[in-house]
């Protein structure tokens, strides 16, 4: 019943455009002679002598599904309505009303199959104001009338009269199908159409009736011209016959011969089968006399025996060179005893006089005394001679010798066995069929064998149930064991309950199937997961272990962030160390060069950046400029213009001085060693560079780096 109510409520919510029928309630007459409510109070005014109670009556209608005990409470599963004030104490309900929102009869549209039963509640209520039509106040109730009925679909109105303690209500009702809906429950939809998708009208029960010239399930197949070849012809509209390629004719039953074929025929398109007496590719060559002149008559066969000669093979009953003479089989008078002979083609027939019979009337006739009638036939003498037999039912023939076989026309359908009776026949139907000729398939689904919401599919002498989830068996009566396939993991125990399963997890696991490893749980706590939520025998933990998952994600993020910070720190340290090494190496190189040259010349220059250089194309007094600049650095300034004057023998002196300088100021030993090896191994490169610098008219200045010697042009800033 609960499922029925849910289905009904859903159907009531469907748009009115999808209705299949309408329940109509027509209010006709209401009597409330005293003008009182249900609690015997006067609606309005005073019940004192000489005064009349006056009510303003309106109605509340509630249409429900069939209930053994009708309840007036909501919901009104089939629909509800509240009328405006229709009258006073006693009145007849008009069919029209100024308020266009109310019509009489009152319609209740259905969007589903009419079940055939209903429950109806009609409440008459009083109001002080026509604008106040609330129905919650029980003091307004004048009367309540309830009924439940069976109702078939039809145009005829059913009358009813409800009599209460002080009131009477006369009304009528019916259920009619919407347009294009048919059947007992208005569940058959059929809309006539005459377009590409069908050409049909609808019968009284909603069956499709094809228009003239159309056939098929939905009348979409045109009926071609009668006689149109089914294989070689077709049609797009009724009454026509279009030929397929290779065929022609009114009925498309003539094949098209090979182009140019003159005296030939075809069995298939594009053939040229020569007629007798003709040959060649196009059957245009005359081969014999028989073909030219056709001398043989009366259907005889002509055979060429040479040029200008032939032989005719005559059909029975004919003779002569050209079979032109018909043979008379009666010429020998074969009929005896006065029988009359009739010449036929290659035979004859004798018409015997009374009292004789046989092919040549050679046999004398029998009488009833000879008992000529068989199978219980009644013999009667013929006044003109001879006899005749009156055959019983089921027999025929001159002597009732033939038994009439009523099964000879194969009247039984669907491989049923036909039994020939005396004057009729009987069809023994195979399983699954019924009817006089076994033409009707028995609907095994008519008894609704499928249980628990299963869908029934009718077959031949059988049916098939498509079960909903959770049920199995021939009739869907067996519930499926949810624990059959061991859905629970990690040693959990499966319990079946309420058409579902519940997993009792061992400590440390969770999830519907105990598939998740959880953070450590309190001692002895077992977790159970069901179809709807996860349970714990001691405390509900809220379902999926989000805390554990979130904690794991946060931990991973912290590790990644810490690792990134550590990598960045290491890279910065390595970069600072590399810069310090490069700086120490450059300073050491400049100091070494300064020490070597300061012993010969006491000169100093300012070291300037490449971006600050200004070329003035003249020689510069580095000694005076150095004094002017007045740099007081821990490193002696170098006159790079004098570097090219260094001799090869000065290199050894430079090495010894560098070792002494190292004692005073520690440098990176690796950078020092690289520079010493570079000076010793690249002497040839240095000589080439010195030569290049000598030729530079701007008195170029260069520094010997770790990688290679370069010329740097120094100019005044």
Swiss-Prot record:
UniProt cross-references to PANTHER family, sorted A to Z: CYTOCHROME C OXIDASE POLYPEPTIDE VIC-2, UNINFLATABLE, ISOFORM C
Tissue: Expressed in both mesodermal and neuroectodermal regions. In the developing nervous system, it is expressed in overlapping regions with deltaB (dlb) and deltaA (dla); in the neural plate, dld is expressed in patches of contiguous cells with dla, while dlb is confined to scattered cells within those patches that will differentiate as neurons. In somites, it marks the anterior part of each formed somite, while deltaC (dlc) marks the posterior part. In 24 hours embryos, expressed in the hindbrain in stripes adjacent to rhombomere boundaries, but not in the actual boundary cells.
Membrane topology per record: Single-pass type I membrane protein
Region (Disordered): 649-693
CDD domains named among the record's database cross-references: EGF_CA
Record-annotated disulphide pairs: 177-186, 190-202, 210-219, 224-235, 228-241, 243-252, 261-266, 274-283, 290-302, 296-312, 314-323, 330-341, 335-350, 352-361, 368-379, 373-389, 391-400, 407-418, 412-427, 429-438, 445-456, 450-465, 467-476, 483-494, 488-503, 505-514
InterPro entries for the chain: DSL, EGF-like_Ca-bd_dom, EGF-like_CS, EGF-like_dom, EGF-type_Asp/Asn_hydroxyl_site, EGF_Ca-bd_CS, Growth_fac_rcpt_cys_sf, Notch_ligand_N
Gene field: dld
Entry-linked Gene3D superfamilies: 2.10.25.140, 2.60.40.3510, Laminin (2.10.25.10)
GO CC list: cytoplasm; membrane; perinuclear region of cytoplasm; plasma membrane
Role played: Acts as a ligand for Notch receptors and is involved in primary neurogenesis and somitogenesis. Can activate Notch receptors, thereby playing a key role in lateral inhibition, a process that prevents the immediate neighbors of each nascent neural cell from simultaneously embarking on neural differentiation. Required in somite segmentation to keep the oscillations of neighboring presomitic mesoderm cells synchronized.
Pfam families, per database record: DSL, EGF, EGF_DL_JAG, hEGF, MNNL
Subcellular location: Membrane
Protein name: Delta-like protein D
Cytoplasmic side, ranges: 569-717
Oligomeric and partner information: Interacts with mib.
Extracellular side: 20-547
PTM characteristics: Ubiquitinated by mib, leading to its endocytosis and subsequent degradation.
Keyword tags: Calcium, Developmental protein, Differentiation, Disulfide bond, EGF-like domain, Glycoprotein, Membrane, Neurogenesis, Notch signaling pathway, Repeat, Signal, Transmembrane, Transmembrane helix, Ubl conjugation
Organism expressing this protein natively: Danio rerio (Zebrafish)
């Amino acid at each position: 019943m609960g499922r029925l109510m849910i289905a009904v409520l859903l159907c009531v919510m469907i748009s009115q455009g999808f209705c299949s029928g309408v329940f109509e309630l027509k209010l006709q007459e209401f009597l409330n002679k005293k003008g009182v409510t249900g609690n015997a109070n006067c609606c309005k005014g005073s019940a004192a002598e000489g005064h009349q109670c006056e009510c303003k009556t309106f109605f509340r209608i509630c249409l429900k599904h069939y209930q053994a005990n009708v309840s007036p409470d909501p919901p009104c599963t089939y629909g509800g309505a509240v009328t405006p004030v229709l009258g006073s104490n006693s009145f007849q309900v008009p069919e029209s009303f100024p308020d266009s929102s109310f019509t009489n009869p009152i319609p209740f549209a259905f969007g589903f199959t009419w079940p055939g039963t209903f429950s109806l509640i009609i409440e008459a209520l009083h109001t002080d104001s026509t604008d106040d039509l609330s129905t919650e106040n029980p003091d307004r109730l004048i009367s309540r009338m309830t009924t439940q009925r069976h109702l078939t679909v039809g145009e005829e109105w059913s009358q009813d009269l409800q009599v209460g303690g002080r009131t009477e209500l006369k009304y009528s009702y019916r259920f009619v199908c919407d347009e294009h809906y048919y059947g007992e429950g208005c569940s058959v939809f059929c809309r006539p159409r005459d377009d590409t998708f069908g050409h049909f009208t609808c019968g009284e029960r909603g069956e499709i009736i094809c228009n003239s010239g159309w056939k098929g399930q939905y009348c979409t197949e045109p009926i071609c011209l009668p006689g149109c070849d089914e294989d070689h012809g077709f049609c797009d509209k009724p009454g026509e016959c279009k030929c397929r390629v290779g065929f022609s004719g009114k009925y498309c039953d003539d094949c098209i011969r090979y182009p140019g074929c003159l005296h030939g025929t075809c069995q298939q398109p594009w053939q040229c089968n020569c007629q007798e007496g003709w040959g060649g590719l196009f059957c245009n060559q005359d081969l014999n006399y028989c073909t030219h002149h056709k001398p043989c008559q009366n259907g005889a066969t002509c055979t060429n025996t040479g040029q200008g000669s032939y032989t005719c093979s005559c059909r029975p009953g004919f003779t002569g060179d050209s079979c032109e003479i018909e043979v008379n089989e009666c010429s020998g008078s074969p009929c005896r005893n006065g029988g009359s002979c009739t010449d036929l083609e290659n035979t004859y027939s004798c018409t015997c006089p009374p009292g004789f019979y046989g092919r040549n009337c050679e046999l004398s006739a029998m009488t009833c005394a000879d008992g000529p009638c068989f199978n219980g036939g009644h013999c009667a003498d013929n006044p003109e001679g001879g006899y005749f037999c009156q055959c019983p039912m089921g027999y025929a023939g001159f002597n009732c010798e033939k038994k009439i076989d009523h099964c000879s026309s194969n009247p039984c359908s669907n491989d049923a066995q036909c039994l020939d009776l005396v004057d009729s026949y009987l069809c023994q139907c195979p399983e699954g069929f019924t009817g006089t000729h076994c033409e009707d398939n028995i609907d095994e689904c008519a008894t609704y064998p499928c249980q628990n919401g299963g869908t029934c599919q009718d077959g031949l002498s059988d049916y098939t149930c498509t079960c909903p989830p959770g049920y199995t068996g021939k009739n869907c009566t067996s519930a499926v064991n949810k624990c059959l396939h061991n859905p629970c993991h990690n040693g959990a125990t499966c319990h079946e309950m309420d058409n579902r399963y519940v997993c009792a997890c061992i400590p440390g696991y969770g999830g519907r199937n105990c598939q998740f490893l959880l953070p450590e749980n309190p001692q002895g706590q077992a977790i159970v997961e069901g179809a709807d939520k996860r349970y714990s025998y001691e405390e509900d933990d809220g379902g999926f272990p989000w805390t554990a998952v979130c904690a794991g994600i946060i931990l991973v993020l912290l590790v990644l962030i810490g690792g990134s910070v550590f990598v960045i720190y290491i890279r910065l340290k390595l970069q600072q160390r590399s810069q310090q090494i490069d700086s120490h190496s450059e300073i050491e190189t400049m100091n070494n060069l300064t020490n070597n040259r300061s012993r010969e010349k006491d000169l100093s220059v300012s070291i300037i950046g490449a971006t600050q250089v200004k070329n003035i194309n003249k020689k510069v007094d580095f000694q005076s400029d150095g004094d002017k600049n007045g740099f007081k650095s821990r490193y002696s300034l170098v006159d790079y213009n004098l570097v090219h004057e260094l001799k090869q023998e000065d290199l050894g002196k430079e090495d010894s001085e560098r070792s002494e300088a190292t004692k005073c100021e520690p440098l990176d030993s690796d950078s020092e060693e690289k520079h010493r090896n570079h000076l010793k191994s690249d002497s040839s490169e240095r000589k080439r560079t010195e030569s290049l610098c000598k030729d530079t008219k701007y008195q170029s200045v260069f520094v010997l780096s770790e990688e290679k010697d370069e010329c740097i042009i120094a100019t005044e800033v």
